[in-house]
A protein has these predicted regions:
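FIC/Doc superfamily catalytic core
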Residues: 1-179, 183-297
Length: 297
């Protein structure tokens, strides 16, 4: 509990710094968002067992030919998700999240992959299973999602990390679609974060084991501690990255930082993983913003 409370307090502090640093820098913020799309797409698809690497994902989005055969499905998965990620970056500020919005996002995601199921919830008789979890009866989907959104909105006084964690677990437990639930669920997280004035998060493929443990915890105990930690760390990581750029820090790798200041690299990595230093993961590499006259640790 103490760890989660610390993350809650850290987020509030980082958010205030971000608003100060972001003033008059909308063009830089836009560039950071655009540069992040490929990483968002790669990680979200990789969690769902896509074989694409980050480099291959970037090439597909830039319409560059790849060196190996890629299925048409994986190509559309990358392009469609990139379109959705870019769409919500502006749309979330204009439109409240509703079931109709969720259906639209799903239609954009699954188009040209499974047009027969794109943009609709599971119908009567369409059951789905994820590992040992059998999703609720299709007849319950709409009611469960309406209750999920109502609960999220009613708890506006709660910390955003707790609200996002609970909503995400509830959405994935419901598994309202035949396909695309995980990717849409992570998109919804960012839709709500952006709408509430926070920065989007990127749940990393390297955290997949912990991510699935969060679902197991929720199903078996009804608790959300692990997902709170995942969302909290992802949010601090996102703020650390943006603040490094917006505050004009010199951005170097943690390996370079360790060498320059004669600090244990493995110790820095451990701190970065816990997000107890202002490090951030960018394209699979841990980095940190070095500021003059400031202790970065």
């Amino acid at each position: 509990m103490a760890k989660i409370l610390h993350i809650f307090n850290t987020i509030n502090s980082l958010r205030k710094r971000y608003y100060i640093a972001a003033a008059g820098k909308q063009s830089l913020i836009k560039l950071l968002s655009e540069a992040e799309v490929a990483e968002q797409v790669y990680n979200s698809n990789a969690i769902e067992n896509s074989t694409l690497t980050l480099e291959e994902t970037e090439k597909i989005l830039l319409q560059i030919n790849l060196d190996r055969y890629i299925t048409e499905r994986e190509i559309f998965e990358a392009k469609n998700l990139a379109r959705v990620v870019s769409y919500i970056d502006t749309r979330a500020k204009e439109q409240e999240l509703t079931l109709d919005v969720i259906l639209l996002l799903h239609k954009m995601l699954i188009a040209n992959i499974r047009d027969d199921i794109a943009g609709r919830f599971r119908k009567d008789g369409e059951w789905v299973r994820v590992a040992s979890h059998i999703a609720p009866d299709p007849k319950e989907v709409v009611e469960r999602l309406e209750k999920m959104l109502a609960g999220y909105n009613a708890n506006s006084h709660e910390n955003i990390i707790k609200r996002i964690a609970l909503l995400h677990l509830t959405f994935e437990y419901t598994h309202p679609f035949i396909d695309g639930n995980g990717r849409i669920g992570r998109v919804i997280n960012n839709y709500l974060l952006i709408r509430e004035g926070f920065v989007p998060i990127n749940i990393k493929f390297i955290d997949r084991k912990m991510y699935y443990e969060a679902f197991k915890e929720f199903e078996e105990k009804g608790t959300i501690r692990i997902m709170e930690e995942i969302v909290g760390k992802a949010l601090t990581n996102s703020y650390h990255k943006r603040l490094a750029y917006l505050e004009g820090a010199q951005i170097i790798t943690l390996a370079e930082y360790a060498k320059k200041y004669k600090i244990s690299h493995s110790n820095l990595i451990n701190k970065a993983n816990r997000q107890t230093i202002e490090a951030f993961l960018e394209k699979g590499v841990w980095k940190i913003g070095v500021r003059q006259n400031k202790n970065n640790l």
